[in-house]
Regions:
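Gly/Ser-rich oxyanion-binding loop with an adjacent helix/lid
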Residues: 1-29, 33-45, 80, 87, ...
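C-terminal nucleotide
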Residues: 2-32, 53-92, 190-338
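Catalytic-core region of right-hand nucleic acid polymerases
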Residues: 44-47, 53-54
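A short, compositionally biased micro-patch
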Residues: 47-49, 59, 121
C-alpha cells in the first residue's frame, strides 16, 4: 500500500512566493456523525497536521485570478471576470466565496478583483477535507484585515459564510462541521452541535494509545458517488422542518414516525415528488441514531472510557443508503485498525 508523504516545506512558506496577505487552515477528519447537519445532529471532527495556505491581494481590473497547487502535483488556474459567474468546479466555488464575503460585508463592496494563490498539503480524496481547508484559508486571508479575525464569534461567522458559499456555488455537498473545525478547531476533537451551532472540545483519541490514519482507495478527486442521494435527503429534511415548523427535525418528538405520516399524506394527495415512506423513515432514523452515537462518543472521550468509545465507533449504524468503502474498512480492521 502506497504511503502519502507531505512536501518538506509548509504550504504557508510556499505560498509566500505570491504577494499579498497569507493565512492557513488545517485539514479535518470526521470521527463520527457525518451527514446529520440538516437534521440538527452532532458531529465529532478532528484536525490534521496537514494544512492548506492561501495568499490574496486585490486587483482593480475586474478579474479574479486563481492559481492552486496540491500535494500530488495537481495544478489549477483560472482568470475569471469578476462579474460573470463561472459554470462549475473550483472556479465557481471560490468565485462564489469572494462574492459571498462581499455580500456579507466582510469584504468591501468596492472589491472588483482578486489574486488568489493556494498551496495545499492535504490530498484531495483522502477524507481530510482538502477543499474545506482551502476554503477556510482563502476566507481567513481575505478577512485578515479585520481586528477581530482571531475571535471565536468572527471565526464562527466566517465558517457559516464558507458553508453558505459552497452550498450555493458548488455541486458537491457541504459538511458544515468541516469549515467550523478548520477555522475554530483545536488539538483535541471538536464536538459540533448543529442544533445550537455550538463547538466544544473533547480529548483526542490518541491518549488511548491509538494513531489516526487516513486510508483511501484512490487520491486526487473528491468523493462524489452519493452527492445526488445526499442532496435529495437534505431537501426532504428541509421540507419536513418547514412543514412541522421546527428549525431542525431533532426538535421533533418521534421524528421518524411523524415524517412517515407526513410523506404518506403527501403521496395520498397525489404528490409525486414525495419519497417512499420507508426511505423517509430510514433517513430520519439514521440521523437520530447517529446523533445519539455521536453524543455517546463525546461522553466516552471526556470520561476516558476507551473501550466504550471503540465499541461505539465499530457498532453498525442505521441503514443510510449512501455509498461507503465497506471493503476498505473491513481490510483495515483485518490489518489491526480499531
Amino acid at each position: 500500500m502506497a504511503l502519502f508523504e507531505s512536501p518538506s516545506t509548509s504550504p504557508a512558506e510556499r505560498v509566500r512566493a505570491a504577494s499579498g496577505r497569507v493565512a492557513s487552515a488545517s485539514g479535518t477528519w470526521v470521527l463520527i456523525g457525518e451527514n446529520v447537519d440538516h437534521f440538527g445532529g452532532v458531529t465529532l471532527v478532528g484536525t490534521s497536521s496537514l494544512r492548506a495556505a492561501a495568499a490574496v491581494s486585490p486587483r482593480t481590473d475586474g478579474v479574479i485570478s486563481i492559481a492552486a497547487r496540491g500535494p500530488l502535483g495537481q495544478e489549477f488556474s483560472a482568470q475569471l471576470p469578476y462579474s460573470d459567474e463561472p459554470a462549475d468546479g473550483l472556479a465557481r466555488r471560490w468565485w462564489g466565496l469572494v462574492h459571498t464575503l462581499v455580500q456579507r460585508q466582510v469584504l468591501s463592496r468596492d472589491t472588483s478583483g482578486m489574486d488568489i494563490t493556494v498551496e495545499s498539503d492535504v490530498p484531495v480524496g483522502a477524507g481530510l477535507g482538502a477543499l474545506y481547508a482551502a476554503d477556510a484559508a482563502i476566507a481567513l486571508a481575505l478577512a485578515g484585515g479585520h481586528d477581530d479575525v482571531d475571535t471565536a464569534p468572527f471565526r464562527a461567522r466566517l465558517a457559516e459564510i464558507c458553508s453558505h458559499a459552497v452550498d450555493t456555488y458548488s455541486s458537491l455537498p457541504v459538511l458544515r462541521a468541516r469549515h467550523s473545525v478548520a477555522l475554530r478547531g483545536a488539538e483535541g476533537v471538536s464536538v459540533v452541535d448543529y442544533a445550537d451551532g455550538s463547538l466544544t472540545q473533547a480529548p483526542h483519541p490518541s491518549r488511548h494509545g491509538v494513531r489516526v490514519f487516513s486510508v483511501s482507495q484512490e487520491l486526487g478527486a473528491p468523493f462524489t458517488q452519493s452527492r445526488e442521494a445526499i442532496a435529495e435527503r437534505r431537501a426532504f429534511i428541509d421540507a419536513a422542518c418547514s412543514n412541522f415548523g421546527v428549525s431542525s427535525l431533532r426538535q421533533l418528538p418521534d421524528a421518524p414516525g411523524r415524517a412517515v405520516q407526513w410523506v404518506e399524506a403527501r403521496r395520498a394527495a397525489g404528490d409525486t415528488n414525495a419519497p417512499e415512506p420507508e426511505a423517509a423513515r430510514r433517513w430520519v432514523a439514521f440521523c437520530e441514531s447517529e446523533t445519539l452515537r455521536s453524543l455517546a462518543a463525546a461522553k466516552a472521550l471526556r470520561s476516558r472510557r476507551a473501550n466504550e468509545l471503540f465499541t461505539l465507533l465499530n457498532s453498525p449504524s442505521e441503514a443510510h443508503d449512501l455509498a461507503s468503502p465497506d471493503a476498505l474498512v473491513a481490510l483495515a480492521r483485518k490489518r489491526g485498525a480499531v
